[in-house]
């Protein structure tokens, strides 16, 4: 069974001059379109999590929700939002795929490799890793961790994904650097323009409404 997914679009990026960086163009498409093209064939359903105006996201035909817990508590709040949404929408679902909104080169076998790492390393959570380090916002999470995550976020500031997953067995799935390249600054975007994202059919155009 393919997992549901949440794209962590978060909020505005000050290092990119404000605004939602997921709409920045790369190879004639916004970053979020590249991510949807990669993730849609690998998942059963996709949620976009953002605390910005939802209107610009609606054109992509996916549900859009803000953080379930107010206070801008970072990616963990978005992950919790995805878990709660997935449990309601897919009661039999076991895992949730999480991806950041600024990684346009995600591979077509992202989910398969995360599942492989999860099984082989007998872990609770699987996250992506490259020679540059780990990428904990790109991973597979058991949706039944929602109650614990919600409790921890409500009890005190646990803003670091690395900090929170320290209490679990975590598997790392290895990828090439370019597969997980993320765009945080104008220089990052300029560097990524020297690479071409895979030429994928825009599967999200026929995705769930």
What are the functions of these language-model segments?
Residues 1-158, 164-179, 187-190, 194-205:
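Nucleotide and nucleotide-moiety/phosphate-recognizing core
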């Amino acid at each position: 069974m393919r997992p549901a997914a949440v794209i962590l679009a978060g909020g505005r990026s000050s290092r990119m001059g404000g605004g939602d960086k997921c709409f920045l163009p790369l190879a004639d498409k916004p970053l979020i379109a590249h991510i949807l093209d990669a993730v849609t064939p690998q998942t059963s359903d996709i949620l976009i999590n953002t605390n910005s105006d939802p209107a610009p996201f609606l054109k992509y035909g996916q549900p859009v929700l803000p953080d379930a817990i107010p206070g801008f508590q970072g990616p963990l709040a978005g992950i919790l939002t995805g878990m709660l949404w997935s449990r309601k929408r897919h009661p039999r679902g076991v895992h949730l795929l999480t991806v950041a909104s600024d990684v346009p080169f995600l591979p077509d076998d992202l989910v398969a490799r995360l599942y492989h790492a999860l099984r082989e390393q007998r872990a609770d959570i699987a996250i992506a890793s490259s020679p540059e380090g780990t990428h904990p916002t790109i991973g597979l999470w058991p949706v039944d961790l929602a109650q614990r995550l919600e409790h921890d976020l409500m009890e005190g500031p646990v803003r670091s994904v690395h900090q929170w997953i320290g209490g679990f067995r975590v598997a790392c799935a290895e990828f090439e650097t370019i597969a997980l390249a993320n765009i945080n600054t104008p220089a990052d975007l300029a560097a990524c323009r020297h690479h071409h994202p895979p030429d994928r059919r825009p599967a999200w155009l026929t995705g769930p409404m």
